[in-house]
Amino acid sequence: MRVAGAAKLVVAVAVFLLTFYVISQVFEIKMDASLGNLFARSALDSAIRSTKPPRYKCGISKACPEKHFAFKMASGAANVVGPKICLEDNVLMSGVKNNVGRGINIALVNGKTGEVIDTKFFDMWGGDVAPFIEFLKTIQDGTVVLMATYDDGATKLTDEARRLIAELGSTSITSLGFRDNWVFCGGKGIKTKSPFEQHIKNNKETNKYEGWPEVVEMEGCIPQKQD
């Protein structure tokens, strides 16, 4: 009887040890698999983050070099959506800021520091061009000037107003017409014509909207004024 009891005990212990071994092996395999999945997910997340394109100031397509201001701007869309002007990741004018209006929208920026000097809009359909002309005459040398049309920016423009804008570096201002879309970035005291200007004519054959051309957009890097 004692021999039989001892044999049963040995068998029971052996079964227990075998069961424990099997369970431990299964657990170890699952643990290895879980850790493997965890590391795989971490590597995948890291790869996704590393391949995500970087975001540059104002959402422009590439970073600006040192001593340059990043800017992006868009004209208005028909008479529904106002223009938008962004400089150095700071939205200067937009419909959301509620500081845009029909006509020519203009932002003045210190060409050395990038600080905003003023933002205004002038109604060139139902307004008076005289205040706009006086405003243009007050712009100081070294000032960066950004302009964008909304609805109609040309009807009330006079030759004098166009000349003052041309002196800021604009080429297209002489041909800006009724309901054309136009964006421009120039400066007071500029010695050459500005490379930053886009102009789309109002043409019923090509207009995107009924009575208005498509929105015109522009981005770039403005050289910082040096002493």
UniProtKB/Swiss-Prot annotation:
Gene: Fam3c
Residues of the signal peptide: 1-24
Domain spans labelled GG-type lectin: 67-225
GO terms under cellular component: cytoplasmic vesicle; extracellular region; Golgi apparatus
Name by which UniProt lists this protein: Protein FAM3C
Chief site of localization: secreted
Molecular functions per Gene Ontology: carbohydrate binding; cytokine activity
Superkingdom per UniProt: Eukaryota
Species: Mus musculus (Mouse)
Subcellular location: Secreted; Cytoplasmic vesicle
Taxonomic lineage from the root: Eukaryota, Metazoa, Chordata, Craniata, Vertebrata
